[in-house]
Amino acid sequence: MNYLPIFLDLRDRHCLVVGGSETAARKAELLLRAGAHVAVAAPALHAGFEQLPDRQRLTRVADTFSPALLDGKDAVIVVEDDAAAAQIVADAARARHLPVNVADKPALCSFILPSIIDRSPIMVAVSSGGESPVLARLLRARLETLIPAAYGRLSALASRYKARVREAIQPGQRRAFWEKVFLSSVAEMVFSGRDSEAEAQLEAMIKDSAAHEPARGEVYLVGAGPGNPDLLTFRALRLMQQADVVVYDRLVSQPILDMCRRDAERIYVGKERDDHAVPQEEINMMLVRLAKEGKRTLRLKGGDPFIFGRGGEEIETLVEHGVAFQVVPGITAAAGVASYAGIPLTHRDYAQSVAFVTGHLKENTFNMNWEGIARRDQTIVIYMGLKGLPMLCEALIKHGLTADTPAAIVQHGTLPTQRVITGTLATLPTLAVEAGLKAPTLIIVGNVVKLREKLAWYRPQAAGEAAAATPLEAPDHLA
């Protein structure tokens, strides 16, 4: 460890910034946010200084540095391109035993400024020790996505209840209690702006702990998106990493499953065509049972839980049994897969509406409003349609679409194994068989498919995909 991380209390302290550049303005802003009074020595100030908060605590005291400016100062920051000039300031500060930071010159620093994640009063600092500030900023950006902005409010809530917890809970149990609180629905309530509910839940947890009553569980119904872990929402990822149990379907990709809490129990419930590992009714009651055992239960579904995901049925059961739950939307396959295939679902010149339908066969037939679906100015997105693809295409032609209507089928959309086959309603069933496509797939029908050749941007297997893809005009032997 090259540096010892230390947080300085600069409130009402006096600091000097040498330099008037945009970077100097950013350094001055940090000092002002920490409550310091800031003096600036520079021949001119960047416009960024005009935008700083609490400017009444900032004063330009000189055009150039002189040692006398260090009188009464508690810290010095130097932003100076001229190495010799920076050396003079650093030496003068060190001679007075003042902490000094020189931007981009670690050798002249007695302290360094980390990248900061501010969730006051919670503060997180990330530093590369001056070796790679850009890398530290990138790491900070990643952490920003994982730490909700409401953490400050959560900390304030805990502070208000600290005395109550001290009175109600034995010293040896307090640490475990607060860990349970911060990993419970109390935190999620604060993050979603339900502060009064969070206080009520915290009150209940204090009473339960004092009386040694069992913990109260909750169900997180989370959409995992179309498969690519980069498409998870921040909220989904946060809940995935705090759940005690993960109940997941076949359509949840392994990379996404790997992002769940490592020590969480995992329960696979299948949900594959004609092979439901666990019947839906049993899944519903499993969620109730797990929550009533006090477990934070993650119900992880591919896509969005409310679009052909049977999420509504599951939370109906939870409501009937008085189980707390929350729903996190996911990017549905239609939106995610179409985007990665380079096919816009709507377009001013081609489609003014879009229909999501399920291609699931029931007794070898479809139960669809074909007249409402088979419209030339509409894009049709068909989930779970691979098995019935020939019948789907035939029915769409029968109900008004032409045989040469553009159509595409996408396998493993958004993943590195994505494959896209394009053709027409007349040719797509044969092309899908020749390509050997396997579920999961998504079918897109409509004139917007014409845009794929121009707009395709995601090519994880460019050479293989080019060989598999077929132009809209089918070869003679397939026409």
Swiss-Prot record:
Sites where the protein binds S-adenosyl-L-methionine: 226, 302-304, 307, 332-333, 384, 413
Region of interest (Precorrin-2 dehydrogenase /sirohydrochlorin ferrochelatase), residue spans: 1-202
One Pfam family named in its UniProt record: Sirohm_synth_M
Residues noted as binding NAD(+) in the record, renumbered to the chain: 22-23, 43-44
UniProt keyword list: Cobalamin biosynthesis, Lyase, Methyltransferase, Multifunctional enzyme, NAD, Oxidoreductase, Phosphoprotein, Porphyrin biosynthesis, S-adenosyl-L-methionine, Transferase
Example of a GO MF term: NAD binding
Reactions performed catalytically: uroporphyrinogen III + 2 S-adenosyl-L-methionine = precorrin-2 + 2 S-adenosyl-L-homocysteine + H(+); precorrin-2 + NAD(+) = sirohydrochlorin + NADH + 2 H(+); siroheme + 2 H(+) = sirohydrochlorin + Fe(2+)
Keyword Transit peptide applies: no
ATP-binding in keyword set: no
Pathway: Cofactor biosynthesis; adenosylcobalamin biosynthesis; precorrin-2 from uroporphyrinogen III: step 1/1; Cofactor biosynthesis; adenosylcobalamin biosynthesis; sirohydrochlorin from precorrin-2: step 1/1; Porphyrin-containing compound metabolism; siroheme biosynthesis; precorrin-2 from uroporphyrinogen III: step 1/1; Porphyrin-containing compound metabolism; siroheme biosynthesis; siroheme from sirohydrochlorin: step 1/1
GO biological process: cobalamin biosynthetic process; methylation; siroheme biosynthetic process
EC number(s) on file: 2.1.1.107, 1.3.1.76, 4.99.1.4
Active site: 249 (proton acceptor), 271 (proton donor)
Region (Uroporphyrinogen-III C-methyltransferase): 217-479
Family, as annotated: In the N-terminal section; belongs to the precorrin-2 dehydrogenase / sirohydrochlorin ferrochelatase family.
Function: Then it catalyzes the NAD-dependent ring dehydrogenation of precorrin-2 to yield sirohydrochlorin. Finally, it catalyzes the ferrochelation of sirohydrochlorin to yield siroheme.
Alphabetized PANTHER family for the sequence: SIROHEME SYNTHASE (PTHR45790:SF1), SIROHEME SYNTHASE-RELATED (PTHR45790)
Entries under NCBIfam families matching the protein: cobA_cysG_Cterm, cysG_Nterm, PRK06136.1, PRK10637.1
Protein name, entry field: Siroheme synthase
Gene: cysG
